[in-house]
Amino acid sequence: MIQEKALLELCDVTLFVGAAKLLEQVSLELKHGECLSIVGPNGAGKTTLLRVIVGLLRGYSGSVKIDGTEVRGLSHERLSHLVSLVPQRLEFLPSFSVREFLELSGLEKTEQSLSLVRHLEERCLPQLSAGELQRVLIAGAVAQGAKVLVLDEPTANVDPIGRRDIEEVLRNCREDIGLSYILVTHDISLALRCTDRTALMKAGRLVWSGATRDPALVQQLSVCYGCNFIELKHADLSAPIIVPT
């Protein structure tokens, strides 16, 4: 259930790297139990914003608070209890079973995370498909017990079956566990099915935010990307599809 109290608050976040302005006065909030997608063209600053939120980029002005705590200056260990970044992949795959990997990821929420991967728990990591591995990495982040999960393009480089599996685990996180997460994606259909609100970014700025099912989203996507988008609906689809034309 979404609560009114903000879990994550960004206020006027601006970031320079040298003379380049990567983020400009980004203000955004995520409520307890809410799931947010961040969408925008390449170079919009989406991944940069995620790196600020998880503490990998700290030279920003403005404020970033999680559960009322300013993240600037926090140790990475303390920050890991507040926010967890789900990687797209692991550079090295140890020969652990999925169960062993989740137990090593964190004891706090191990059983909860295992519920997301019940049919995979005895499989070894190197045997998993890209989609199955991404599902396990999401479960690993859940095991760490962070208040906010952050996902950067989780469906990149996966086939349709893997994409379906990732959507399923995101829905479980949202509907069954009640976790809050931020999802950066180019996949508008994924955002429609798996998030409550969508924020659009362009050239380092937040240009629009609103309910993911807001009818204004189609028009705002057209403005953001500079091309026309249309919404397609069908009785067999759980959510409409928005595509460029």
Predicted regions and their residues:
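The feature captures the beta-strand-to-loop junction immediately N-terminal to the Walker
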Residues: 39-41
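Helix-to-loop junction immediately C-terminal to a conserved catalytic motif
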Residues: 54
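Conserved ABC transporter NBD signature motif
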Residues: 62-70, 79
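Conserved ABC ATPase signature
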Residues: 124-128, 132
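Catalytic Walker B motif of ABC-type/P-loop ATPase nucleotide-binding domains
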Residues: 149-153
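H-loop/switch region of ABC-family ATPase nucleotide-binding domains
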Residues: 185-186
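ABC ATPase nucleotide-binding domains
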Residues: 224-245
